[in-house]
Amino acid sequence: MSKSASRARLADIIRNRSFGRGEITLASGRKSDFYFNLKPTMLDPEGAALLAELTYEALRDEQVDFIGGLEMGAVPLAGAIAQLSWLKNHPIAAFFVRKKPKEHGAKLAIEGLAKGESLAGKRCVIVEDVTTTGGSAIKAVEAVRESGAEIVLVLTMVDREEGATEAFAEAGLPFRSLYKASEFLNR
């Protein structure tokens, strides 16, 4: 399937499985009359494959060691991309950032690293399923930077176009999205 056909098919899957209208309170605290819940798309076999494919293609020219983001939205996405990257002979390892470190066990804030493995000096991409203001992704960026990593890109599947671009620019973070909310609202 061509890139444009993959993108169109994924948009259809998102529209049918993950987009809705109706009043909702977003993670940012804002109210909205539409929403995206990408988990049904990320956990669908075809949706996961297409998200991984298009995300991997968006990262192809970046030199990336790790990909991850804040739990829960980044977990299935980072895992799918890591798997595809292995199959493409260009492995990108995955991790996720806990919203709050576990209070037991190793008490980790960043999960997915092997014993003794570190993000220090590594080039990382932060992924997010849906971005509104950028606040959740910036929390992940802060945790990953604290571990010594370099953030090369913040990549979201759907940008709601409600301030994230400006927030990332202000924070000096490159930002890209696979889709804009307006692509779904104007159809």
Curated annotation (Swiss-Prot):
<comment type="function">
    <text>Catalyzes the transfer of a ribosyl phosphate group from 5-phosphoribose 1-diphosphate to orotate, leading to the formation of orotidine monophosphate (OMP).</text>
</comment>
<comment type="pathway">
    <text>Pyrimidine metabolism; UMP biosynthesis via de novo pathway; UMP from orotate: step 1/2.</text>
</comment>
<dbReference type="InterPro" id="IPR029057">
    <property type="entry name" value="PRTase-like"/>
</dbReference>
<feature type="binding site">
    <location>
        <position position="132"/>
    </location>
    <ligand>
        <name>orotate</name>
    </ligand>
</feature>
<feature type="binding site">
    <location>
        <position position="102"/>
    </location>
    <ligand>
        <name>5-phospho-alpha-D-ribose 1-diphosphate</name>
    </ligand>
</feature>
<dbReference type="InterPro" id="IPR000836">
    <property type="entry name" value="PRibTrfase_dom"/>
</dbReference>
<feature type="binding site" description="in other chain">
    <location>
        <position position="99"/>
    </location>
    <ligand>
        <name>5-phospho-alpha-D-ribose 1-diphosphate</name>
    </ligand>
</feature>
<comment type="subunit">
    <text>Homodimer.</text>
</comment>
<feature type="binding site">
    <location>
        <position position="160"/>
    </location>
    <ligand>
        <name>orotate</name>
    </ligand>
</feature>
<feature type="binding site">
    <location>
        <position position="98"/>
    </location>
    <ligand>
        <name>5-phospho-alpha-D-ribose 1-diphosphate</name>
    </ligand>
</feature>
<dbReference type="GO" id="GO:0019856">
    <property type="term" value="P:pyrimidine nucleobase biosynthetic process"/>
</dbReference>
<comment type="similarity">
    <text>Belongs to the purine/pyrimidine phosphoribosyltransferase family. PyrE subfamily.</text>
</comment>
<dbReference type="GO" id="GO:0044205">
    <property type="term" value="P:'de novo' UMP biosynthetic process"/>
</dbReference>
<dbReference type="Pfam" id="PF00156">
    <property type="entry name" value="Pribosyltran"/>
</dbReference>
<dbReference type="InterPro" id="IPR004467">
    <property type="entry name" value="Or_phspho_trans_dom"/>
</dbReference>
<dbReference type="GO" id="GO:0004588">
    <property type="term" value="F:orotate phosphoribosyltransferase activity"/>
</dbReference>
<feature type="binding site" description="in other chain">
    <location>
        <begin position="128"/>
        <end position="136"/>
    </location>
    <ligand>
        <name>5-phospho-alpha-D-ribose 1-diphosphate</name>
    </ligand>
</feature>
<dbReference type="InterPro" id="IPR023031">
    <property type="entry name" value="OPRT"/>
</dbReference>
<keyword id="KW-0460">Magnesium</keyword>
<dbReference type="GO" id="GO:0000287">
    <property type="term" value="F:magnesium ion binding"/>
</dbReference>
<feature type="binding site">
    <location>
        <position position="104"/>
    </location>
    <ligand>
        <name>5-phospho-alpha-D-ribose 1-diphosphate</name>
    </ligand>
</feature>
<keyword id="KW-0808">Transferase</keyword>
<keyword id="KW-0665">Pyrimidine biosynthesis</keyword>
<keyword id="KW-0328">Glycosyltransferase</keyword>
<protein>
    <recommendedName>
        <fullName>Orotate phosphoribosyltransferase</fullName>
        <ecNumber>2.4.2.10</ecNumber>
    </recommendedName>
</protein>
